[in-house]
A protein has these predicted regions:
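Glycine-/small-residue-enriched transmembrane alpha-helix faces in small-molecule transporters
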Residues: 1-36, 143-173, 193-197
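Transmembrane alpha-helices of multi-pass small-molecule transport proteins
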Residues: 28-77, 104, 108, 162-170, ...
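Alpha-helical transmembrane segments of compact multi-pass small-molecule transporters, enriched
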Residues: 6, 18, 41-45, 97-111, ...
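Hydrophobic/aromatic residues within transmembrane alpha-helices
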Residues: 25, 34, 38, 85, ...
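Transmembrane alpha-helical core positions of polytopic small-molecule transporters
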Residues: 12-16, 70-79, 102, 136, ...
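Specific transmembrane alpha-helical segments of multi-pass solute transporters/efflux pumps
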Residues: 14, 18-19, 47-98, 108, ...
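Helix-helix packing/entry segments at the starts of transmembrane helices
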Residues: 35-37, 91-102, 170-193, 223-263
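Loop-to-transmembrane alpha-helix entry segments
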Residues: 59-66, 95-98, 114-134, 138, ...
């Protein structure tokens, strides 16, 4: 197996732990505060590490705009929406709904990269969207039950998955011209700058964060391992592996994340949640198979 594939496998297994860790930390601190802490820690690690490359990089005006956009979309929006959604949903649902990201990669690639969408890919994306809807509704309205209490959180998590997909697509052209470490450092720095107003607003209007030992340890893990190292490795893989193939490995996250939510947090998976997850995986398999044939 190529080295990049092994790295993708391991990195997605690590990313799968983030849902349960974040769910625990969010019991003590607010969503924007956690996102700000992750981005601040990531910036403090990556910027000094990548400083020589950042100074030496000959970035065009388009590169600067893309890096700013990747920071705002892929870090500020994705992190904030992910945390807010997770605070009002479950770690298991968050893990399953991340499969919206690869489907979004297929849907957004024609818009952002000029790639054509085949009928099979469109059908696969539709199945993935249907699966996400089944998870959000968790049944048939009027037949089984009304929308579950955390449906709003699930919808926000879907938007977070779309933001993550947009990040990968926006960043890829820059990654083909500049080192992954430089792109990651710039992006996270922009994300931290854009997140600061949201964090300040949360501090001013909400309860103060409670920095319990588990909140500190969890935040450090999310900042160092998941953000700084995780995204540096992720961008390294994006340099070497085509986006549709990267999407295949994202399937590891819902399985690992959902199992951790059940085992670690005692969450329950309903039949509709499992069915929705299977629909998403079936849709993703269809789109990837179509892309391979194309």
């Amino acid at each position: 197996m190529p080295t990049a594939y092994v790295v993708l496998l391991v990195s997605n297994l690590i990313f799968a732990t983030g849902y349960s860790v974040s769910r625990i930390v969010l019991e003590d601190i607010g969503p924007a505060t956690l996102a700000m802490a992750r981005l601040a820690i990531g910036s403090l690690i990556l910027v000094p590490w990548a400083w020589r490359g950042m100074v030496a990089a000959k970035l065009s005006r388009e590169d600067h705009w893309r890096l700013a956009l990747t920071g705002v979309v892929g870090f500020t929006l994705a992190f904030a929406l992910g945390n807010w959604g997770l605070a009002h949903s479950t770690a298991s649902n968050a893990a399953l709904l991340i499969t919206v990201e690869p489907a979004s990669l297929i849907l957004l690639s024609p818009l952002l990269l000029g790639e054509r969408l085949s009928r099979r890919e469109g059908l696969g994306a539709a199945l993935a969207i249907l699966g996400a809807a089944v998870i959000v509704v968790n049944g048939i309205p009027g037949v089984t039950q009304a929308l579950v209490p955390h449906w709003r959180g699930d919808v926000i998590l879907i938007l977070s998955g779309v933001a993550y997909a947009a990040y990968s697509l926006i960043a890829r052209p820059v990654l083909l011209r500049h080192p992954a470490l430089v792109v990651t450092a710039y992006s996270i720095l922009w994300g931290a700058v854009a997140m600061l107003p949201l964090a300040v607003l949360e501090w001013a209007t909400g309860p103060p964060p409670v920095w319990t030992p588990r909140a500190v340890v969890g935040t450090l893990y999310l900042g160092v391992v998941m953000t700084a190292l995780g995204y540096a490795v992720w961008n390294w893989c994006l340099e070497r592996v085509e986006t549709p193939r990267v999407a295949i490995f994202l399937n590891i996250q819902p399985l690992g994340g959902a199992l951790l939510g059940v085992w670690w947090l005692g969450e329950r998976l309903t039949a509709f949640t499992v069915a929705g997850g299977l629909l998403i995986l079936a849709g993703l398999h269809l789109t990837v198979k179509a892309r391979r044939r194309g």
